[in-house]
């Protein structure tokens, strides 16, 4: 559990959900950290290299991502599902409503690390996973929310280590 020990864990499953339908967007104030801003810039640069549209920042998706990062850090688990076992899309839907929309879909990429991580590291890890790469390059996505949470002495799967948990939630509503 020494600080010098470097472990990077990446959930190899990137999920996508698409129940039809639903809600009016509004923009609660959310300030992005330097890491979160860098992840947004780098994802959009990657998408531009592949001739895909730039993702718009979504305060609602960012709030969903932060809530999940906090829950995983506090409860000591790492998964797309919520602590109660509910599907990730149901959690995201509480923040990024689907009502009043004909089409609604969300996806999510996660990672955690015991070392400082930058946006290049995050994208490199996600790029190595076919499921995560598909989320990064999904042409349907229009919006993104990002959370990079630093948790000291995180319990459970994190073994009491200081960790960084990064959650990106992707979405489209039309």
Where are the regions that the model predicts?
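Extracytoplasmic
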Residues: 34, 52, 87, 105-107, ...
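Disulfide-stabilized extracellular recognition modules
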Residues: 112-174
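Surface-exposed patches in mature extracellular/periplasmic domains of secreted proteins
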Residues: 49-64, 76-85, 100, 133-148
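Bacterial N-terminal signal peptides that target proteins for export
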Residues: 1-8
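A short alpha-helix/helix-coil micro-patch that ends at or immediately precedes a cysteine
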Residues: 27-75
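Sec/Tat signal peptide C-region and signal peptidase I cleavage site
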Residues: 19-23
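Bacterial N-terminal signal peptides
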Residues: 9-18
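Short, surface-exposed glycine/acidic/tryptophan-bearing loops
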Residues: 63-116
């Amino acid at each position: 559990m020494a600080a010098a020990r470097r472990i990077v864990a990446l959930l190899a499953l990137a999920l996508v959900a698409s129940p039809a339908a639903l809600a009016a967007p509004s923009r609660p104030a959310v300030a992005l950290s330097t890491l979160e801003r860098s992840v947004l810039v780098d994802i959009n640069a990657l998408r531009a290299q592949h001739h895909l549209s730039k993702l718009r920042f979504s305060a609602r998706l960012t709030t969903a991502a932060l809530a999940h990062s906090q829950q995983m850090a506090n409860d000591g688990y790492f998964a797309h599902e919520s602590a109660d076992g509910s599907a990730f899309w149901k959690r995201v839907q509480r923040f990024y409503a689907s009502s009043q929309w004909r089409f609604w879909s969300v996806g999510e990429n996660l990672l955690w690390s015991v070392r400082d991580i930058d946006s290049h590291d995050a994208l490199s890890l996600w790029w190595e996973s076919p499921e995560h790469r598909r989320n990064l390059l999904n042409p349907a996505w229009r919006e993104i929310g990002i959370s990079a949470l630093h948790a000291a002495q995180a319990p459970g799967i994190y073994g009491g280590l200081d960790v960084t948990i990064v959650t990106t939630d992707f979405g489209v509503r039309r």
